[in-house]
């Protein structure tokens, strides 16, 4: 192991694997290590027996739930926007040749105590039971404005500079109601709070356009895609990619200790008495605990069920967003469900997650509004984990630390962190202009 690398990556979570892949493709010499004997770190994927061991402390799950290996339960389940940045990153690295994607059936939102399909186009707005007849027209006009908006063509701006006008002022022009503003901001533009209302509208409009374009791509009921066999496939695909570019992966390396020189800059990583030298370290917060701070906790429930989520048109895979205001909370709640259709459970079984930022000392109670939407469950597990963010100055120590995964069930925030880290590490922006058709292998099935 006494070699020299340009970058050593610690942890095989999604963010670390994507960065390791991007840096390998850029021609850097990368060593990738993990203290665990499995891929994925916090974002690993468990079979049924592993799930049982983690949450129940028993070696084997009951036989009536089916074969353990038919389950691939992602610990950080997140859907990908079909035309989104993550898919572009995957195509950029060509890792898509190791993965098969399938469209997700449904995209729903919880408004006024009901689960409703998220309308994202003028046509859908007119059909949506979310709004009365006059509100439908107003929303339809707003969606048309968004659809036609082109920054380079002032004729589509309606006299507004969206880099200066706030989202609140733009929406006021169309006279939309609170609930409509709520589902547009949280379930279409995928904002996690209401700060966007006081920021320039450009970002929200571009997010809405991305949603509508992704939706149109697969002619399905949602703008999302998900890999067959779940996200656990991603770290392994990146390990294969890294090998193609001469990168090295090592699992089961205990006590990966980051070494520093007299100036406080990274000089290498020691494991089992051997030190690999390097100029930069990329890692998750668990490898450099003295350079991160706690920023909150995520509470989640994991359910095994024998039916799809009620009121979602029997969707075999679905996301339901519960905006904070609808629950009288400070943060949104997310429901994620997947099944045999993505090969993450045996036929007839569904895996559902409910997640949110914990706001009290009783997170199980906080999750109840989301759990209530699931209907009867066969098994229910609760989990809570701390979230951390880096507090170091990477220009001084050459340590590039990812932020812990949040409660969202889509990749929006994750990929923003990855792209920011890539820029810090390399000093350049990642070029995301790619042919999106490269990630569409399985959607015709």
From Swiss-Prot:
Any one GO BP annotation for this protein: small GTPase-mediated signal transduction
Tissue expr: Expressed in roots, rosette leaves, stems, floral buds and siliques.
SUPFAM superfamilies assigned to the protein according to its UniProt record, in alphabetical order: FAD/NAD(P)-binding domain (SSF51905)
Keyword Oxidoreductase in record: no
Highest rank taxon of the organism: Eukaryota
Molecular function via GO: GTPase activator activity; Rab GDP-dissociation inhibitor activity
Any single Gene Ontology cellular-component annotation: cytosol
Complexes and interactors: Interacts with the GDP-bound form of RABA5C (via C-terminus).
Name the UniProt record assigns to this protein: Guanosine nucleotide diphosphate dissociation inhibitor 1
Gene from which this protein is expressed: GDI1
């Amino acid at each position: 192991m006494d070699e020299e690398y340009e970058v050593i990556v610690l942890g095989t979570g999604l963010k670390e694997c994507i960065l390791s892949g991007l840096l390998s493709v850029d021609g850097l010499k990368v060593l990738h290590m993990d203290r665990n004997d499995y891929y994925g770190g916090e974002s690993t994927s468990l079979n049924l027996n592993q799930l049982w061991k983690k949450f129940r402390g028993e070696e084997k799950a009951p036989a009536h739930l089916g074969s353990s290996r038919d389950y691939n339960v992602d610990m950080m389940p997140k859907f990908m926007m079909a035309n989104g940045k993550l898919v572009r990153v995957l195509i950029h690295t060509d890792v898509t040749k190791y993965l098969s994607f399938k469209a997700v059936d449904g995209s729903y939102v919880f408004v006024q105590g009901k689960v409703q399909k998220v309308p994202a186009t003028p046509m859908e707005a007119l059909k949506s039971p979310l709004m009365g007849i006059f509100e439908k027209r107003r929303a339809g006009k707003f969606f048309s404005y968004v659809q036609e908006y082109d920054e380079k063509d002032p004729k589509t701006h309606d006299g507004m500079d969206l880099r200066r006008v706030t989202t609140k002022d733009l929406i006021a022009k169309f006279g939309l109601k609170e609930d409509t503003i709520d589902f547009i901001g949280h379930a279409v533009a995928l904002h996690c709070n209401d700060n966007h209302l006081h920021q320039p509208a450009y970002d929200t409009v571009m997010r809405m356009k991305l949603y509508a374009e992704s939706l149109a791509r697969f002619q399905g009921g949602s703008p999302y895609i998900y890999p067959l066999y779940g996200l656990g496939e991603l770290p392994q695909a990146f390990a294969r990619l890294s090998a193609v570019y001469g990168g090295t992966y090592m699992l089961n390396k205990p006590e990966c200790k980051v070494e520093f020189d007299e100036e406080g800059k990274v000089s290498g990583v020691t494991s089992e008495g051997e030190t690999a030298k390097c100029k930069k370290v990329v890692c998750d917060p668990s490898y450099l605990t003295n350079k991160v701070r706690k920023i909150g906790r995520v509470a989640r429930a994991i359910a095994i069920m024998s039916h799809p989520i009620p009121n979602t048109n029997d969707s075999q895979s679905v996301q339901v967003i519960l905006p904070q205001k609808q629950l009288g909370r400070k943060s949104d709640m997310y429901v994620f469900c997947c099944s045999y259709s993505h090969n993450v459970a045996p036929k007839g079984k569904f895996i559902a997650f409910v997640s949110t930022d914990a706001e009290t000392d009783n997170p199980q109670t906080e999750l109840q509004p989301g759990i209530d939407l699931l209907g009867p469950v066969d098994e229910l597990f609760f989990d809570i984990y701390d979230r951390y963010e880096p507090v170091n100055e990477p220009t001084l120590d050459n340590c590039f630390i990812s932020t812990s995964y949040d409660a969202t069930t889509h990749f929006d925030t994750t990929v923003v962190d990855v792209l920011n880290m890539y820029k810090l590490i390399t000093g350049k922006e990642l070029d995301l202009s790619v042919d999106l058709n490269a990630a569409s292998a399985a959607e015709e099935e």
